[in-house]
Design a protein with these regions (language model features):
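A broad structural signal for alpha-helix termini and local helix breaks/kinks
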Residues: 27, 51, 80, 150, ...
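Generic structural signal for helix capping and beta-alpha/helix-loop junctions
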Residues: 41, 192, 212-213
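GST-like fold's C-terminal all-alpha helical module
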Residues: 101-197
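Conserved beta-strand edge residues that scaffold enzyme active sites
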Residues: 37-40, 164, 209-210
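GST-like domain detector, emphasizing the conserved glutathione-binding G-site
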Residues: 1-129, 222-223
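Residue-level recognition of oxygen-bearing side chains
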Residues: 71, 187, 200
Length: 223
């Protein structure tokens, strides 16, 4: 599946689709972007053949498709001949961080963001404060590990930004509503500031037709 004519990345502004758009723009991938809402009335028929889960992101091309942000990042990096998805000796290290992050740091961020952000955006019920506390405890434990790792180094793998950094930070662009105490971890906070200096990460939707997410009522976000 060479990225090129007829290749589309279907996305929304939610965390994992945002991640995929940031990857594609960072790599300069040859594709077009299309905002999508597979769960909207009348849309399931169109998107189910591309992804039976109906979740975004979806990379589609004539005759095929690929879903899940990690798989899409791997595919696009290979297509563009980039080491953004690390290969060779660095690949196990990168996969280690992807695996650990998914089950630990990113999971902690997701737990808190879902309660304070996603549920409140879409009216899915009150904040479950027990789950928030569990998420914050996991955040503190895993942020401490990243803090130790990032002292004296700029990126998680090697000497340049990689997909491991993008993936680890999946939920941090939404920290205005999640309220995770990132500043308590100076090396981790510096790492994220470096990531925000990468234009594709900081503003992946620049120039794209992409409706904003519903706002989170401010009185609910931290209640």
């Amino acid at each position: 599946m060479p990225a090129g004519v007829g290749t589309k990345l279907f996305f929304s502004r939610n965390p994992n689709p945002r991640l995929a758009v940031a990857v594609a723009r960072h790599l300069g991938a040859r594709l077009t972007f299309e905002f999508a809402s597979p769960f909207a009335p009348g849309q399931a028929e169109r998107f189910r053949p591309l992804n039976p889960n109906l979740s975004l992101p979806i990379l589609a091309w004539p005759g095929g498709s690929l879903w899940e942000a990690d798989a899409i990042a791997c595919r696009l990096s290979r297509d563009m001949g980039s080491d953004f998805w690390r290969g060779g000796e660095d690949e196990p290290d990168m996969i280690r961080w992807l695996s650990w992050g998914k089950e630990n740091f990113a999971r902690a961020c997701d737990m808190v963001h879902f309660e304070r952000g996603t549920k409140q955006r879409y009216g899915l019920g009150p904040i479950d404060h027990q789950l928030v506390e569990e998420g914050l405890k996991l955040f503190q434990a895993t942020a401490a590990i990243l803090e130790t790792t990032l002292v004296g180094r700029q990126w998680l793998v090697g000497n340049s930004v990689s997909y491991a950094d993008f993936r680890m930070a999946t939920f941090l662009p939404f920290n205005d509503v999640a309220g995770l105490p990132l500043s308590d971890y100076p090396a981790l906070a510096r790492w994220y500031r470096r990531l925000e200096a990468v234009e594709a990460w900081r503003d992946p939707f620049k120039g794209l037709a992409a409706p904003h997410l519903p706002p989170v009522p401010r009185q609910e976000a931290m209640r």
